[in-house]
Amino acid sequence: MSQTLAAVEGSLGSIGYGLAAIGPGVGVGIIFGNGTQAMARQPEAAGLIRANQILGFAFCEALALIGLVMPFVYGY
């Protein structure tokens, strides 16, 4: 009985992280989509826009990595 509960608990953790990864995935898509559109509208500001794009990407991916690490830290 306890083996079955452990298997279900592990599966729920994977599903939870999969759902949590949707947010950063959507965020990265929005960042690069809007950044590309902004560079097309103002090519002279491409360097500044690209720098802000990369910074936003790093913050979004940090959220995904935190979501991946937290179950290991708390022992779920």
UniProtKB/Swiss-Prot annotation:
Principal localisation: membrane
Gene3D superfamilies, sorted: F1F0 ATP synthase subunit C
One GO cellular component term: plasma membrane
Gene Ontology terms, MF aspect: lipid binding; proton-transporting ATP synthase activity, rotational mechanism
Site (Reversibly protonated during proton transport): E61
Record's subunit section: F-type ATPases have 2 components, F(1) - the catalytic core - and F(0) - the membrane proton channel. F(1) has five subunits: alpha(3), beta(3), gamma(1), delta(1), epsilon(1). F(0) has three main subunits: a(1), b(2) and c(10-14). The alpha and beta chains form an alternating ring which encloses part of the gamma chain. F(1) is attached to F(0) by a central stalk formed by the gamma and epsilon chains, while a peripheral stalk is formed by the delta and b chains.
PANTHER family reported in the protein's UniProt record: ATP SYNTHASE LIPID-BINDING PROTEIN, MITOCHONDRIAL (PTHR10031), ATPASE PROTEIN 9 (PTHR10031:SF0)
Name by which UniProt lists this protein: ATP synthase subunit c
Native organism: Streptomyces coelicolor (strain ATCC BAA-471 / A3(2) / M145)
Gene: atpE
